Amino acid sequence: MTAVTTPDNAPELTPLDEVGDAWKEPSHGLRHEAVLAGARRLRARLAAASPVLAVRTLPVTTLPYPTRYAFQGAAASPAPFVTLTHRCLLVRFRQGDAVRTLLFNPTDVERARRTPFFAKLEGAVGSRVAKLLSTQFDPLEKQLERLGVAPADVDYVAFDHFHTQDLRGLLGTADGAAARFPNAKLLAPRAEWDEWGHLHPMQRAWYVADGREGVREDRVVFTDGDLLLGDGVMLVRTPGHTAGNQTLFVKTDRGVWGCSENGTAVDNWSPAHSRVAGVALTAKHQDLDVILNSNTPEGAAAQYTAMSLEKILVDPVPAAPEFVQMFPSSEVSPSLLAPGLSPSYLLQKVESGDVKSVGAQSFNAPGGFGAAAPR
């Protein structure tokens, strides 16, 4: 087994080896079995962990998205688009004696509009219609301010994958452009970072091609394996949707949650129980345990395995235990323009703990933000 190493510029992170080399198995079937065996070991570790201190959900934007991608072509609806609500998670957690802050998916909405797929869609329908189909929420900085969190308090930023992302505003650039989160490290899977520089034609529609150009790489932590960030919070490799896809797992006072864009609704992870017309029938006929968010078909088998891993690590939804607490970073939302395509159960947010009291504690506690903890 290849040892998972700690990134050189983030010695405070702990490598996780439960899944190990399973993703390198060349046989799709054997890889699936090996990854899920590792996932069960990882589940035991996560279940025994202390919970994170606080989690909040910060809405970013709504956007139209092809129905055929959202439910892998399984939804029996004439509506060409669903409406997705894209959200960011704020997580506060202990890392040794310090309290740390992570933003997961802090997408720069204005820069993301340059993503070729969405730029062409806006060009086809016109900017006025595009604005009617999307809603922008308060900037993340304003939402964080209401929670008592300043941009300088953010220690880490990470994304489930780099589709639609332009990182220059978040991290600043080598030529002096300011960073929105001046103290944050970006936790970036090396596999996807490298692919971003040499995109395949099947990938180009979903990336802002120059979205990483000029970014200060001294602010980037390149990762190659699964990582424990601190008490109750892990970033786990879930390749398939993209080469470097990763899922955030957090243990909260309401059980274990995961967050990724491998699916767009709880239905994707539990299709047998879906009330979206066509989804349960497709799953039954094809003997599928999950239905993909399928805009990137080149990695479908790996994505299926990744979603199966996610199901193992998270807990059931207490109010609807046939579904699991996999929170889509872009969740299908009810829309009059997409009748019959509402999720069978809407998650909408992950919420745990008290962010403000944690923030006050972190500044005063030994080893908190005011201490010379590793950066």
Language-model features: locations:
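C-terminal regulatory/interaction regions
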Residues: 2-49, 299-375
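Active-site/pore-lining binding-face segments in mid-to-C-terminal subdomains
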Residues: 230, 234-311
